[in-house]
């Protein structure tokens, strides 16, 4: 059984820059002990007959197959553009010439 001291709780609170009351220190002490005991339970669980996994759920790739498809015609893509040049969208520059 894990035992957390008041000094450890106060040190953790200090590291987190928290000011906690005596009641909060006691509550946090009990909470941390509970968490550490649960972690110890998990650590000591017999998993010798359990197959290792990388994911909790047995998921397969659910994405569709990647297939090239015909895009929209250039004229249609540029139809509502305010300014075009050489078959491309023309937008205001966001960099100075010196930045390029």
UniProtKB/Swiss-Prot annotation:
Keywords associated with the record: ATP-binding, Ligase, Nucleotide-binding, Protein biosynthesis
Catalytic activity line of the entry: L-glutamyl-tRNA(Gln) + L-glutamine + ATP + H2O = L-glutaminyl-tRNA(Gln) + L-glutamate + ADP + phosphate + H(+); L-aspartyl-tRNA(Asn) + L-glutamine + ATP + H2O = L-asparaginyl-tRNA(Asn) + L-glutamate + ADP + phosphate + 2 H(+)
Protein biosynthesis as UniProt keyword: yes
GO molecular function, one term: glutaminyl-tRNA synthase (glutamine-hydrolyzing) activity
Entry-linked InterPro entries: Asp/Glu-ADT_sf_sub_c, GatC
The protein's Enzyme Commission number: 6.3.5.-
Disulfide bridges in this chain: none
Enzyme kind, highest EC tier: ligase
Listed GO biological process terms: glutaminyl-tRNAGln biosynthesis via transamidation; regulation of translational fidelity; translation
Regions crossing the membrane: none
Subunit structure: Heterotrimer of A, B and C subunits.
Role noted for this protein: Allows the formation of correctly charged Asn-tRNA(Asn) or Gln-tRNA(Gln) through the transamidation of misacylated Asp-tRNA(Asn) or Glu-tRNA(Gln) in organisms which lack either or both of asparaginyl-tRNA or glutaminyl-tRNA synthetases. The reaction takes place in the presence of glutamine and ATP through an activated phospho-Asp-tRNA(Asn) or phospho-Glu-tRNA(Gln).
Family stated for the protein in its record: Belongs to the GatC family.
HAMAP family (UniProt xref): GatC (MF_00122)
Name the UniProt record assigns to this protein: Aspartyl/glutamyl-tRNA(Asn/Gln) amidotransferase subunit C
Species, as recorded: Staphylococcus saprophyticus subsp. saprophyticus (strain ATCC 15305 / DSM 20229 / NCIMB 8711 / NCTC 7292 / S-41)
